């Protein structure tokens, strides 16, 4: 571990405030080095944290946390905050089972004012805290720290609109690094990055190209020209940012300050001290660089957004979570990405939509091959779904690639704008089930429950890679709204067809014939069901569809077996197991049924296998639970 004499003194923001302001740049260097060391060992979100070091130090130096409230949007950039608030010695446990969460979590620290993980919630939460303080006659300050990527979501502007009309002491810090996970899209980022600045950069490049050879021959001239160039760039950027941003945010009722260099910690302290003394809604526009201080991350902030580890000093390259070593088995995301490109090559009506998750959802190749049919709408899930509805109305075939946890954010649009009108929109629902290190805010445990009650919806859950392709093709050709949900990570190793074969909608298949006990399994739980069935001589049905569900198969299994076990990687409440019970009740069948899913609990973060075991859904746990449930404890016999 690199020596860090200042950082070693800090176990709380109170310790931080004992430092002289002139010591803060040195502390920032030590904190950045500590991040490189700790994230290099544990993995986790990387580039965004490097870009927020000075801002985090300045905020805790000026504001009286935890009395004053800091609300971090999304939480990708919260590692420096955790280090400065007493969790430095636990950073080696980051995102591991039983260790620190990768996002702010209220039950983890009094300094984590609001639990986050999803985008664009910070302004609304901080506004609620500020309003409470006003009602109680307090004098605390509430601060929302939000990135320019998160500002592309409507919820952020809803909160700005509300805050500007309220007489509360609220500071919104706009951390502008021109990135979310991928480069930002839409009109707002273009608004923040002015045309004048781009024109100035172009002019300077032209001047350099035309005069560089001459200046090289004059001693000292090139160095002087570079200083002038830098000054012109800085002045142009500051003037244009201030002019445009002032107009936007002051029209919302905020007093605008900025733009300010987000890596000049001493100046940030001065600016924040002034802002803390002001009354009413304030907005501070801070310019930072994602990955600051680590050249590889600065040059490729998308790749280094999240990492698995760092190389030893002098190492050539850092492997990223987004580019794992080649695996023999493809991930479900890769299967979807290939199917999407294959389908688009055969059908010019296919269009793909993502809410700012191009890399994570497997759309990089599609964007490269079909740029005119690729739509990244920013962090705007609600708009993504309604936009897809408009495309479908005019004869296009939209595919919305979205994580299960983020589809929750667009539920009204899914119901009102898609399902009630029976529009043929296909939802490719990635990260369904347990996701591991990202924890409960990113777990996809509710989609079967909230999708199967929606009229006109087709809901499918593949059990392996090839079935994923089959069900994508099947649901794409259905003249109805449909969702195919699949888990994070690699599949089972099943050979994947290159064709566009389809299956009958609403029909499952028998994977194994057995006696007495029937496993009715959905999606990712088919594999553990088969493993357990071998030991218990049980029948296994791969249902494929949750809606419409195969009533005929369920009734046949119920009448030919003594008992039924349902398995799903979804909440038990309202899930696929409940659908099976509804079928049995409808047909007047009374048989013992064991529902195996995620109980009514908030899951933790950590290794997915460990989490599944704790939830009773690993093959070993399923076998144990079934044996305990069997009336005669004699397995299936």
From Swiss-Prot:
Pfam families: DXP_synthase_N, Transket_pyr, Transketolase_C. Keywords: Isoprene biosynthesis, Magnesium, Metal-binding, Thiamine biosynthesis, Thiamine pyrophosphate, Transferase. It catalyses: D-glyceraldehyde 3-phosphate + pyruvate + H(+) = 1-deoxy-D-xylulose 5-phosphate + CO2. GO terms for molecular function: 1-deoxy-D-xylulose-5-phosphate synthase activity; magnesium ion binding; thiamine pyrophosphate binding. Its cofactor is Mg(2+); thiamine diphosphate. Its EC number is 2.2.1.7. Thiamine diphosphate binds at residues 76, 117-119, 149-150, 177, 294, 381. Catalyzes the acyloin condensation reaction between C atoms 2 and 3 of pyruvate and glyceraldehyde 3-phosphate to yield 1-deoxy-D-xylulose-5-phosphate (DXP). This is 1-deoxy-D-xylulose-5-phosphate synthase.
